[in-house]
Amino acid sequence: MSLLTEVETPIRNEWGCRCNGSSDPLAIAANIIGILHLILWILDRLFFKCIYRRFKYGLKGGPSTEGVPKSMREEYRKEQQSAVDADDGHFVSIELE
């Protein structure tokens, strides 16, 4: 049996909990960790699109163009754009006669 869970035990005619009024540091720490975990999980579910979009796109600065001639920067930008445009072409329209 785990020390971190509350166990209901029959006490006379009522059901009670052994952890009520406990000053056990392990039980207190487990309760705090459980509450923090619940709060973080709720925030994650509420804002997961914002959070993961920020990590996926916001933190990527791309390669540095410092010291690269402007003509090469333009060529690189065009290559990147054509790669994005080519990726959009994976949808194929099929016409049946």
From Swiss-Prot:
Membrane topology term:
Single-pass type III membrane protein
Tell whether Chaperone is among the UniProt keywords: no
**InterPro entries in UniProt:** Flu_M2
Main localization, broad class: virion
- Site described as Seems to be involved in pH gating, located at 41
Q: Which residues form a coiled coil?
A: none
The PTM Phosphoserine maps to: 64, 82, 93
Name the Gene Ontology molecular function terms of this record.
Answer: monoatomic ion channel activity; proton transmembrane transporter activity
- Residues assigned to the Virion surface compartment are 1-22
Where in or outside the cell?
Virion membrane; Host apical cell membrane
Q: How is its activity regulated?
A: The M2 protein from most influenza A strains is inhibited by amantadine and rimantadine, resulting in viral uncoating incapacity. Emergence of amantadine-resistant variants is usually rapid.
Keywords, in A-Z order: Disulfide bond, Glycoprotein, Host cell membrane, Host membrane, Host-virus interaction, Hydrogen ion transport, Inhibition of host autophagy by virus, Ion channel, Ion transport, Lipoprotein, Membrane, Palmitate, Phosphoprotein, Signal-anchor, Transmembrane, Transmembrane helix, Transport, Viral ion channel, Virion
GO CC: one term?
virion membrane
Top-level taxon of origin: Viruses
Any one of the GO BP annotations: uncoating of virus
Output the Pfam families linked to this UniProt entry: Flu_M2
Region (Disordered) residue ranges read: 59-88
**Lipid moiety-binding region for S-palmitoyl cysteine?**
50
UniProt biased composition (Basic and acidic residues): 71-80
Instruction: Give TM regions.
Output: 23-43
Q: How does it assemble?
A: Homotetramer; composed of two disulfide-linked dimers held together by non-covalent interactions. May interact with matrix protein 1.
As a miscellaneous remark, the entry gives:
When the channel is activated, one or more imidazole moieties of His-37 probably become bi-protonated.
Q: Record's domain comment?
A: Cytoplasmic tail plays an important role in virion assembly and morphogenesis.
- Family under the similarity heading: Belongs to the influenza viruses matrix protein M2 family.
Q: What is this protein called?
A: Matrix protein 2
Query: What taxonomic lineage is listed for the species of origin?
Result: Viruses, Riboviria, Orthornavirae, Negarnaviricota, Polyploviricotina
Which gene name belongs to this protein? M
